[in-house]
């Protein structure tokens, strides 16, 4: 039997891009291609790129260059594939003219066509080697579930719609089938992602779909309830990311707080507020009522006291005054957000914010970002310290002789904190990766927790 053709794969960018990579790799394996872990062991290389900010663009271009140097046969996909250069031609083709093919994001079919053109598929594909859940690039016990592609918003700092297009929601039955297959494969935590999770179904007018004979609207609240019911059957978690602060978010909070889904639909919201001053938010083309946001955050916590809120912000946006920045700091103190990230504003090629007046010097932008993070870390440290002495449910991510590393319901992988768990002293308390364990919290710093089983 002849050796199967081998494809190398480099995946860059956000969790949405990671899901695209998983779909491409799943299709490659379904058609009988092997995935090579090295450049020299591959017949060609696929590079999935990111093009959101300048640093990501450069990282992607460097990765393409490295793949060309080490292998020579490279197909490029992802957000950077849709980006144009100053001359109007494709940026990748201009910088790296030797690439075999370039596609935009979420383009499994186009990538496979390019692979077929340069590396014909085997005659006897090993379809049985591909699990129903597909090939995943995350650890076995958690996975990302992408429910839609694209975005209908036109935030002035963002170019995602120009690369990924307008919102396209996946059929609800398709999403539920993937979720079920993932749970059956041993996944203990599903991280629901998209460009705008709250907008799920807007493009199809919340059309009713069917799953196992039951009607489910193509709508965030209905989908979350269905996922929560499914997760409860498998003793698993569902975590929501990229939740735009629409009024409909209020409907999801009770699912986290009470009833059959409590403990399965996690009391966790990733809501990118971006700023708090109405004038800055208007220039960003974001919802501009910060006082109402504060009221909603307080109401959410009244309904669900255990709620963790993660958010991201931009400091030093064009035209931001010192007073407007102080308003942002006041918001962080009052809202008491649990997990916060902040970026010093950086111009992104193609973003309409580049045309706004009042661009701030680099040192001012960075100084404001640093001040923001000082305040945010003080708030986070206070909230985390309240967990000392409590017993929390922890999902174990890593195990070594020194103990385990896991996460609570308040911590998403890669971006939030962790719990350092003491080694189990009794056989009855031993744990492995993917286990849920009860941990008594004995210590905390500004970001992480320590505890014992």
Curated annotation (Swiss-Prot):
EC number(s) on file: 2.8.4.4
Classification via CDD domains: Radical_SAM
All residue ranges annotated as the TRAM domain in the record: 385-453
Keyword Thylakoid belongs to the record: no
Domain Radical SAM core positions: 137-382
Function text: Catalyzes the methylthiolation of an aspartic acid residue of ribosomal protein uS12.
Protein's name according to its UniProt entry: Ribosomal protein uS12 methylthiotransferase RimO
């Amino acid at each position: 039997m002849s050796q199967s053709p081998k494809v190398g794969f480099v995946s860059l960018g956000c969790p949405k891009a990671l899901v695209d990579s998983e779909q491409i790799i799943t299709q490659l394996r379904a058609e009988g291609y092997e995935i090579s872990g090295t450049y020299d062991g591959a017949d060609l290389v696929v590079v999935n790129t990111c093009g959101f900010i300048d640093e990501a663009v450069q990282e992607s271009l460097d990765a393409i260059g490295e793949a060309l140097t080490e292998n020579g046969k490279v197909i490029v996909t992802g957000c950077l594939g849709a980006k144009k250069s100053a001359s109007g031609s494709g940026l990748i083709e201009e910088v790296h003219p030797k690439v075999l093919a370039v596609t935009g994001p979420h383009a499994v079919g186009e990538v496979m066509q390019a692979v077929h053109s340069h590396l014909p598929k085997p005659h006897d594909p090993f379809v049985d080697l591909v699990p129903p859940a597909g090939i995943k690039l995350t650890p076995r016990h958690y996975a990302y579930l992408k429910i839609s592609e694209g975005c209908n918003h036109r935030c002035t700092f963002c170019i995602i719609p120009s690369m990924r297009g307008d919102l396209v929601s996946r059929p609800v039955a398709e999403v539920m089938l993937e979720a079920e297959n993932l749970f059956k494969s041993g996944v203990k935590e599903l991280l629901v992602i998209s460009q705008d999770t709250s907008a799920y179904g807007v493009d199809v007018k919340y059309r009713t779909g069917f799953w196992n004979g039951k009607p489910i609207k193509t709508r965030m609240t209905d989908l979350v309830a269905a996922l929560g019911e499914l997760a409860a059957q498998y003793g698993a978690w569902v975590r929501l990311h990229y939740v735009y602060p629409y009024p409909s978010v209020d409907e999801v909070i009770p699912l986290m707080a009470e009833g059959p889904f409590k403990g399965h639909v996690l009391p966790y919201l990733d809501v990118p507020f971006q700023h708090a001053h109405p004038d800055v938010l208007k220039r960003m083309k974001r919802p501009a009522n910060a006082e109402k946001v504060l009221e909603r955050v307080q109401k959410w916590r009244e309904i669900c006291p255990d709620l963790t809120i993660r958010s991201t912000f931009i400091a030093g946006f064009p035209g931001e005054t010192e007073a407007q920045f102080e308003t942002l700091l006041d918001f962080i103190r009052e809202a008491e957000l649990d997990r916060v990230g902040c970026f010093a504003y950086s111009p992104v090629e193609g973003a309409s914010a580049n045309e706004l007046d009042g661009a701030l010097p680099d040192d001012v932008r960075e100084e404001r970002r640093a001040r923001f993070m000082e305040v945010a870390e003080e708030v986070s440290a206070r909230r985390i310290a309240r967990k000392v002495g409590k017993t929390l449910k922890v999902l174990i991510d890593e195990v070594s002789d020194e103990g385990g590393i896991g996460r609570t319901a308040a911590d998403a992988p890669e971006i939030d904190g962790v719990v350092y768990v003491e080694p189990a002293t009794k056989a009855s308390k031993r744990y492995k990766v993917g286990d849920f364990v009860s941990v008594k919290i004995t210590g905390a710093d500004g970001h992480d927790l320590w505890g014992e089983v």
